[in-house]
């Protein structure tokens, strides 16, 4: 059998229904994670005593147990758990993006993904050169992933292979940009306004990184989580990337698009090009962010030149 791509993919599966009955049940979690468990990739799964046994059984059924590591760690032992009380206090005072499907505990799990990946980079049980994160509950109910059009089970392994293959494996942190945001929100004085509504910054549910770039960026994201939480804000992890996109500009490889085309566009723009141009490129141009605008243009032009999108598609060049 062909060996998996040289990348360890990481995810986490926790039952939060006991904290909030609007959160998914264990059964719902296991149904949504099923497509991910079928991927022939090195996989590390963090979870609890209520989720890991069933996940292990599914992975064994697919004969992928040998390339899987299960880490059973209860939520109370996670790095972010020390901030749970503060998160609850924050939400009592200021939570304009309130969503009954979430709770303080789900926020804690979500923001711990940075630490999950850093811990895995340090362990590196499969001795891979690269690492990636994928959210657990991306199943579409039809044995596919809802972050991809025309999904097939080889698209994730193909992405990981392309980013890690010799002789030119990536040395960057790869993530998809969702939109343009005003850089004034990097200023701590403007954080309250920033968090008055959900800002579309990046698609945080899937990223791939070389260890050096990833360690720097994920460590900084942990710092921003602490800073933002102590300031009284923070509802989800994607908005933490606003500072990181600038601070580590040359360490980040940006793909562009909406949530439904993350996998399609992760290597090059191929789907929903109207969104990439009108929602991302034009907004960068109108905001006066020239470098960001030119980078989107170059990616779109490359896709045209390589016949990945038709020449008549909306493009700024």
Regions found by a protein language model. Name each.
Residues 140-144, 165-168, 173-183, 187-287, ...:
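Catalytic core and acceptor-binding pocket of nucleotide-sugar-dependent glycosyltransferases
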Residues 53-65, 84-86, 245:
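Short, aromatic/basic amphipathic alpha-helical patches
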Residues 27-42:
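Short, acidic, metal-binding catalytic loop of nucleotide-sugar glycosyltransferases
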Residues 1-28:
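N-proximal low-complexity "stem/linker" segments adjacent to membrane-targeting elements
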Residues 44-48:
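Short internal beta-strands
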Residues 111-171:
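GT-A fold catalytic core of metal-dependent nucleotide-sugar glycosyltransferases
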Residues 49-56, 184:
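Short, charged/polar "capping" segments at the starts of alpha-helices
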Residues 63-124:
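Active-site-proximal specificity loops/subdomain of glycosyltransferases
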């Amino acid at each position: 059998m062909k060996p998996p791509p040289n990348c360890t993919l990481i995810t986490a599966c926790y039952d939060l229904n006991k904290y909030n009955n609007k959160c998914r049940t264990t059964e719902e979690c296991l149904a949504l994670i099923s497509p991910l468990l079928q991927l022939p990739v090195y996989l590390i799964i963090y979870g609890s005593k209520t989720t890991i046994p069933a996940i292990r059984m599914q992975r064994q059924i697919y004969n992928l147990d040998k390339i899987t590591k299960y880490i059973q760690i209860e939520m109370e032992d996670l790095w972010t758990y020390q901030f749970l009380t503060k998160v609850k206090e924050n939400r009592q005072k200021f939570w304009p993006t309130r969503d009954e499907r979430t709770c303080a505990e789900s926020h804690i799990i979500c923001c711990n993904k940075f630490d999950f990946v850093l811990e895995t980079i340090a362990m590196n049980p499969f001795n891979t050169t690269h690492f990636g994160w994928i959210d657990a509950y991306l199943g579409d109910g039809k044995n596919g992933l809802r972050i991809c059009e025309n999904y097939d089970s080889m698209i994730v392994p193909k992405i990981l292979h392309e980013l890690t293959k010799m002789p030119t494996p990536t040395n960057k942190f790869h993530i998809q940009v969702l939109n343009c945001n005003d850089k004034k929100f990097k200023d701590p004085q403007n954080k309250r306004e920033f968090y008055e509504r959900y800002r579309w910054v990046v698609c945080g549910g899937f990223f791939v990184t070389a260890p050096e770039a990833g360690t720097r960026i994920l460590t900084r994201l942990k710092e921003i989580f602490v800073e933002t939480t102590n300031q009284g804000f923070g509802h989800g992890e994607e908005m933490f990337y606003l500072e990181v996109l600038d601070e580590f500009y040359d360490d980040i490889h940006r793909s562009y698009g909406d949530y439904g085309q993350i996998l399609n566009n992760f290597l090059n723009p191929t789907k929903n090009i109207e969104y990439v141009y009108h929602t991302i490129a034009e907004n960068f141009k109108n905001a006066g962010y020239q470098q960001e605008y030119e980078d989107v243009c170059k990616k779109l032009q490359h896709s045209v030149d390589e016949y990945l999108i038709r020449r008549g598609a909306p493009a700024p060049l």
